[in-house]
Regions:
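Blade-edge beta-strand/turn elements of extracellular beta-propeller
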Residues: 50-53, 131-141, 181-191, 255-267, ...
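Beta-propeller blade signature
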Residues: 119-126, 245-252, 302, 359, ...
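Hydrophobic beta-strand segments that make up the repeating blades of beta-propeller
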Residues: 94-98, 158-167, 213-217, 288-293, ...
Length: 585
């Protein structure tokens, strides 16, 4: 997030550069980047087809974000979305986080509360005909306070997905009762937290078979905000103005309660955290944590396997961009975009910074590949929030989708080439070497200008083409159904853990086709404030079956399936055999 510092607008916006200089530099950089990446051929531009069906399927959610004259930072940060199957009927349902009202002047220490249905969080149940029904009140998920993010995970291994909702001044854990209702168990579980929480993630950090909870916090902030911007043009303050704060890490005790252990684990380094992604980046069998920090060093916490973590961002080459500069890290995803078996990182940020693509070198370090892949030139003038790798055309290569929009609602006054409202960005992966923008050739959705924030992915209609939901700050949610015409095949995998956590979160799945192997780490986290379909998706290209499906469960058990037919969702139960130490790559 890129706001302003106290003082006049010229000095406050120094990191954004002066308007004329910014335009000249941007043009020069874009031209320079274009020379490093070949112009995509007609064959590279495989157009997608996404259709916004929100209104026709009954989703009328509008995010509530008051816009005050005092420019409280909270009001521009948006909220998240979750795609998950809360009632186990095989169809993805939809949960949307909402804000709360507050006046133009708010006393210090105030926690805004929801005063009516327009401020409720919303749960939409997907019916058999593909439409959605608002079941919020029936489920007991109206919520409280000013909501921000959501994380989905079955923390008690009862087979029902639970919800954790973050916000300002306290968070809420909702236990799924398995009968269409949820119970707020925050106090009993001990996970209420404090401060301004943003993204959260469920992961089994210690391998005991129960999901632990990592909760990011943004900054130390209150309503007695300083004045930032010009005298006649107040703006949202830059995060440099505020002190950092550490995350919260809750160990699952296995009895419905949690113990906060960030300090003991070595995860209490103060940051300005907005996005989280979890993967075993060095393939040592232990989940690691990447934290996207806003305008300071990014964090990569390496799991040492002894119950502690060590922050290795600088050593690994992911703390700064390829020019050695910090950037406004917001959304993040961990995925193997070049199919070499090592999970890579995408971190998006604000305009004039370039989205950061870090390719895993396989030796504990990463290479900054935004330039060589063409990503830098495409994203220089854009501001990204929610972001996910996904294979929209099932060709076996993970593409990129980004929810976009600047944080400053007055940005055009100072920088005419930058925009508060932006189209979503869809980038096609060309064999793990280049990314090309296929949005302009992909229909009306990618011409719309939204104040994009949250983003979740999942196959909403179970047709094998991954869909998406994007939320707007102070605007509607957009359900984007993937109608891309393709002859390619696919395979979806739903894991059911027994020794491992029930969701199989943290498992690494390798699928081999005639073109090689792909790897996916099972997770619901990544992006920004959001939670995606827990099922793993693989594009098989022309193959109608996978030669091999190999699953390394969090327990260490390795399970191998041969000649697995595609074009279906396959449930795989974890076997009870002793762990096999055979590597997955």
């Amino acid at each position: 997030m890129r706001g302003l510092r106290p003082g006049n607008q010229v000095s406050a916006a120094s990191r954004l550069l002066l308007p004329a200089a910014a335009c000249a530099l941007a043009a020069a950089l874009v031209m320079g980047f274009a020379q490093t990446a070949a112009t995509p051929s007609a064959g590279d531009i495989v157009a997608a087809d996404f259709v916004d069906v929100s209104s026709r399927v009954g989703v009328d959610f509008v995010h509530q974000a008051p816009h005050s004259s005092r420019k409280y930072l909270l009001e521009t940060m948006g909220s998240g979305v979750a795609l998950f199957d809360y009632d186990n009927d095989g169809r993805l349902d939809l949960f949307l986080v909402n804000g709360a009202p507050f006046p133009d002047f708010v006393p210090k220490g105030t926690i805004p509360q929801k005063t009516g249905p327009e401020y409720w969080n919303r749960l939409y149940h997907q019916k058999s005909d593909g439409s959605f029904e608002d079941v919020t009140a029936r489920a007991g998920l109206e919520g409280a306070g000013y909501g921000m993010g959501v994380a989905v995970g079955d923390y008690d291994n009862d087979g029902n997905e639970d919800l954790y909702v973050t916000g300002l001044g306290g968070n809420h854990l909702y236990h799924n009762n398995g009968n269409g209702t949820f119970t707020d168990v925050t106090a009993k579980a001990g996970v209420g937290g404090s401060g301004w929480s943003t993204s959260a993630a469920w992961v089994d950090l210690d391998g005991d078979g129960f999901l632990d909870l990592v909760v990011l916090r943004y900054i130390v902030w209150d309503w007695d905000d300083v004045w930032c911007g010009a005298r006649d043009n107040r703006g949202y303050c830059h995060p440099d103005v505020f002190p950092p704060i550490s995350m919260l890490v809750y160990h699952n005790n296995g009895d419905g309660t949690f113990t906060e252990e960030a300090h003991q684990l070595g995860l209490d380094k103060p940051g300005k955290a907005l996005g989280i992604a979890i993967s075993d980046y060095d393939r040592d069998g232990h989940p690691d944590i990447f934290v996207a920090n806003d305008s300071m060093l990014e964090f990569l916490f390496h799991n040492k396997g002894n119950g502690t973590f060590e922050e290795q961002g600088l050593e690994a080459g992911v703390a700064v961009d390829g020019d050695g500069r910090t950037f406004a890290g917001m959304g993040v995803d961990f995925a193997d975009y070049d199919n070499d078996g090592w999970p890579d990182l995408i971190v998006d940020d604000l305009a004039n910074q370039k989205y950061a693509l870090f390719r895993n070198a396989g030796d504990g370090t990463f290479n900054y590949d935004s330039y060589v892949t063409g990503l830098a030139g495409v994203t220089l003038l854009h501001s990204g929030w929610g972001v996910r790798f996904f294979d929209y055309d099932n060709d076996g290569w993970k593409d990129l989708l980004v929810a976009q929009g600047h944080d400053l609602d007055t940005i055009e006054k100072t920088f005419p080439d930058l925009h508060y409202r932006e189209p979503p960005l869809l980038l096609r992966n060309l064999g793990g070497k280049k990314f090309v923008n296929v949005g302009p050739a992909s229909g009306d959705v990618f011409t719309q200008r939204w104040v994009g924030r949250g983003l979740a992915i999942g196959d909403i209609d179970n047709d094998g083409r991954v869909d998406a939901v994007i939320t707007e700050n102070g605007g509607p949610a957009h359900i984007l159904m993937n109608r891309t015409a393709t002859a390619n095949h696919w395979l979806g995998i739903k894991l059911v853990g027994h020794k491992s956590n029930r969701d199989g979160i943290g498992a690494v799945i390798r699928v081999e086709t005639s073109k090689g192997s792909q790897w996916v780490t099972v997770t619901t986290s990544s992006s920004y404030l959001s939670s995606s379909d827990v099922r793993a998706h693989f594009g098989l290209g022309a193959d109608t079956a996978a030669k091999t499906v190999e699953i390394r469960w969090p327990s260490g058990i390795v399970q191998t399936l041969a000649n697995v037919a595609g074009d279906r969702y396959l449930r795989v139960d974890e076997p009870t055999a002793a762990p096999n130490t055979k590597p997955t790559r």
